[in-house]
């Protein structure tokens, strides 16, 4: 017997940030049956799992998404390797893949969906044939993961980051409304790197081509990220939109960097149709700005239908008083 629909089982951290959020309306089940009860609800913390079992709320823990983020979750709990657990962030990109009928991917687990590779194991990393130094330029999520796996292979890793902190875009994006838990993407990797003796991290260290060449390191990995365009080229327009130079244009990067927007209404034109346009609209509205949301789609953020969020996204903007066109 299932007492919850899939959309509620698999709520995202954007709308259900608390681990074990279903407990209040599922704890009655143990009182009406002597059958073993399995419960879910974004249970990512071993402490929470143990607590629910000891309290008699559940007999078993269902951890589908947490096990996608870290397939070795049960082993790590059993072996007391708690600090090595790569916790699910509840973004539902895995659910979106399932809804699309394509191989499942995971923001936290880059090896998800690669299990078909014969003779390959995500935690058995082949040692470097020749120990040598490698340079990773950029310490956002991709750069951190690259540095971590190179270090696992035994290379001497130099990680260079232009800014004053590690994490890249995920640091600023996780400051937007509803996305705080996404910071786990950087937190996990930063912690693992800090435990390694063969990793040297340099902050506030922008490098140009000449400086990279002068280091004399044979293998260089560039993970410097990307920025949003300001010219209007996107899903609906393959050429720049005329007249944008006559108004103040901001990108999500500007908003995440804390740009001062000044007085007057803010128009958000969402031609990307992913999740971020609605997040920015919700965030700015929450800060007290008068927000108008314009989209080329028939609904707000159609991608979020695949992550089971769309109705909550659109309903939330309406409740905030955001004009939608």
Identify the role of each PLM range.
Residues 169-218, 304-325:
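N-terminal Rossmann-like dinucleotide/flavin-binding domain of flavoprotein oxidoreductases
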Residues 128-160, 166, 202-216, 224-305:
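Rossmann-like dinucleotide/flavin-binding elements
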Residues 17-20, 56, 78-81, 175-179, ...:
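Short, hinge-like loop/turn segments at secondary-structure boundaries
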Residues 13-18, 121-126, 131-132, 172-184, ...:
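Short, contiguous acidic/charged loop-to-helix segments that flank catalytic cores in large enzymes
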Residues 221:
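N-terminal Rossmann-like NAD(P) cofactor-binding module of classical short-chain dehydrogenase/reductase
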Residues 28, 51-52, 76, 192, ...:
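Well-formed, non-transmembrane alpha-helical positions, independent of function
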Residues 31-32, 54, 152, 195, ...:
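Residues at the C-terminal ends
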Residues 1-137, 141, 145-157, 165, ...:
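Flavin-dependent oxidoreductase catalytic cores
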